[in-house]
Structure formats: C-alpha cells, structure tokens
C-alpha cells in the first residue's frame, strides 16, 4: 500500500510563552547568529517581510529543568532506545555506546566497512527496526570511502545485548562524491515498516560532480544526492515508490530538492513526515515531506551564498513545495521530533528542532490558522539531536568534543 500522510492536524495545546511577532520568510540574510527570541508569523509566502515588533502578548511560562545525564561523549550524533530503556548513542568518530542503569559503556561492533571520518563524515544516525523485540536489528548510517570518493551507507546489524554482530551493508548511495560535507543521514520508519533516509546534496561550491556544481544533483531524478529515499528493511526498493515507473528516475527516491536534511521525524499518529534542512547563509527550512514532491534546492531558496549573493533568484514557484518555516539568520537545524508524551502536557503535539549554530532547541507549534509559534530553549552547546525518551522526558545530544546527553524535566 502506498504510504500517504494525513492532512495537517490542529495543535490545540496552549502555548505558555512570551511571544513577539515576525514574518517567517525574508529576502535578506546575515551571518548566522543565535536568535533567542520567541517568534510568531504567518504561513510562509515569497513576499513576507521580516519584523521584530513585539505584540505584547504575555503567557505563563512552562517550567522545566535541564539535567545532565552523561558527559564526555565525543561528537555524539544519534540515539535510539532499547525496549528495556537503555539508550544506544553513536559518536561520529566511529563508536556506539550504551547508557544502561546510569552506566555508559562502549558497544563492540564487528566491523564498519571502509568508514570515512573527516569533517562532517563519520558514523551518524542509529535506529531500531520496528520489530526489534523479535529480530534485534539495528540500523546505522555512516560515510564510507575516502576524501576523493565517498558516499552514505546503511549498515544493518544484530544487537545481542553486548555487541553489534553480523553487520551487513544493505545500501550505498549513488553516485559517489568527493569531500567531507552534506551526508544528511537521518533514518525514520513508516507504518508499513519501510524506512526513509535523508541524503545530502554532496557539498558546497566549488565542489563539482561531472563538470557542474554538485548541489545541482538535488534536482536530478537519476541521482540519489539531495533526496529523501524510501527503502525496505533489507535495503531493497518498494514497488510503490513515486518514481518507480519513471525510467529516467532513480526508483529509491521519495522526495527531492533537498540541501542537507539532518532532522527527520515520522509521526505514527498523524502519519506526517517532518524535516528540518540546512540552508547556506540563512534559509534553513522546516518542511512537511510528501511522496514525489520537489522541495526546491537549489533552484528555489531563501539562502545566500557564503561568498555573497543569492543562491536563487526565486523563493517560491508553483511546482515547488513551500517550507512551513524558514530561519534567517541560520540556526543550523539538526535533530527533530514531535512530542507525544505526558510529562509536558502543554507541549504535546509540538515539534522540537535542535540547532547547532544557535545552540538551542526550538519548540514549534503550528496552529489551525497556520500561524507558526516558536519558543527557543537555550542549551549553550551545539544541539545535534533531540528525541522523546521512553519515559516521556525530552533528551538532547550536544555535538561537542566533550558532548553531553541532557534531559528536560518538568519542575
């Protein structure tokens, strides 16, 4: 059965914040900097003009505390909960660790074939099979190869309680690329037990592939770069993917026109798939991902080049899906989840996006009238991932040389 998301649900939980008004999209851009304001704005349109005028609306703050659970994680990237409540955590340098009963230990991995660790490259996301309690399968994304030729790979292994055994590479992204940027790499599962994998566009200018800027791969349907891919749990391609019958397109593609998605969440209740995506200088995006749709990069974008000037003359087009939210200046979003727990009743149904540059978690509420309201939760470290734990608390991984696992708890 072809997977189709439901329509956007109404989020009715009250927002307990102080808020200020801002239009969501802007044609200007500055060097990325922290933005610790709380923002409200209309549904994105190409003509929106940014403002910072407070509307003097006061609401009671939600009280919470930040608890440091673990310190000294080396560049942690992803996390996944085992049925017993233990947490598997990846470190980009090639390690998997387990936090169990307050103790952090390294997990042995039989082999990660040809792993490439440099810049943004290395061991990245981790996810459990939906039927992990029956098959013990764990999925890892990582960069393989070397600086001259590399790609994102998906490794599947079994967790025997102490080690990851029987590793098997079930998928390698094509074409190969050079450099050490834009691997994407988040994994989420759909209700039919197929998985979506976010793949980056390959890197920034002047990096090229086949004589043109590599980022143009995001618009090419014969390339897996700059895409969200949909695969079966063995790495094979579902027969109902949107481009399977297009002989000039790659059949693994689910959506395209992406720069570098590092936040991806599939909500089993609404059956919606949300993604946060890095822009260049500004133009970070929150998108609702749908099968077969084009999200614009680099043909349509609010980003500016790092060297100056606009990436694209267009910020909207009829054949391109508009983002639900755009951040300028950049927050560098990474990690995304939609809260469905009971610990924070007022936050239920809200999205939470990690932010590397602004070193915060952004709480996002989309109201019935399509107004988007944001609260920023300062963390003070680069936020790589944010997840809801099995206990209903919110967990945050910080991307530092001495990274931390932080838990948000109500007071």
Stretches with model-predicted labels:
Residues 258, 370-390:
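Conserved blade-ending motifs and adjacent loop-strand segments that build the rim/top face
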């Amino acid at each position: 059965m072809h997977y189709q998301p439901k329509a956007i649900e109404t989020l009715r939980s009250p927002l307990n914040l102080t808020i200020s008004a801002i239009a969501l999209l802007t044609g200007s851009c500055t060097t990325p900097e922290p933005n610790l304001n709380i923002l409200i704005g209309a549904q994105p349109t190409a003509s929106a003009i940014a403002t910072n005028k407070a509307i003097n609306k006061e609401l009671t703050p939600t009280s919470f505390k930040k608890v440091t659970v673990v310190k000294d994680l080396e560049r942690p990237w992803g996390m996944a909960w085992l049925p017993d409540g233990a947490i598997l955590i990846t470190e980009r340098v090639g390690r998997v660790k387990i936090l169990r009963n307050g103790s952090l230990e390294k997990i042995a991995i039989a082999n990660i074939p040809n792993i490439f660790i440099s810049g943004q490259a290395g061991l990245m996301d981790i996810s459990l099979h939906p039927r992990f309690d029956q098959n013990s399968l764990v999925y890892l994304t990582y960069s393989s190869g070397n600086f001259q030729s590399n790609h994102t790979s998906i490794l599947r292994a079994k967790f025997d309680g102490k080690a990851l055994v029987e590793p098997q590479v079930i998928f390698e992204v094509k074409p190969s690329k050079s450099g050490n940027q834009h691997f994407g790499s988040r994994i989420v599962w759909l209700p039919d037990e197929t998985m979506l994998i976010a793949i980056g566009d390959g890197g920034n200018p002047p990096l090229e592939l086949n004589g043109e800027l590599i980022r143009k791969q995001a618009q090419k349907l014969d390339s897996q770069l700059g895409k969200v891919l949909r695969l079966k749990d063995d790495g094979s391609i579902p027969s109902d993917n949107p481009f399977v019958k297009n002989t000039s397109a790659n059949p693994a593609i689910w959506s395209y026109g992406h720069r570098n998605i590092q936040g991806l969440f599939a909500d089993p209740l609404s059956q919606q798939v949300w993604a946060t995506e890095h822009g260049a200088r500004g133009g970070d995006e929150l998108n609702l991902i749908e099968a077969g749709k084009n999200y614009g990069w680099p043909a349509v974008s609010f980003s500016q080049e790092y060297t100056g000037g606009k990436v694209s003359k267009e910020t909207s087009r009829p054949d391109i899906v508009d983002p639900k939210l755009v951040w300028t200046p950049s927050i560098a979003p990474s990690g995304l989840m939609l809260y469905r727990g009971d610990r924070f009743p007022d936050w239920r149904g809200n999205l939470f996006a990690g932010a590397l540059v602004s070193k915060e978690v952004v709480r996002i509420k989309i109201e019935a009238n399509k107004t988007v309201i944001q609260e920023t939760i300062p963390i003070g470290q680069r936020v790589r991932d944010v997840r809801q734990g099995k206990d209903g608390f919110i967990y945050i991984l910080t991307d530092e040389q001495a990274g931390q696992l932080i838990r948000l708890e109500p007071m």
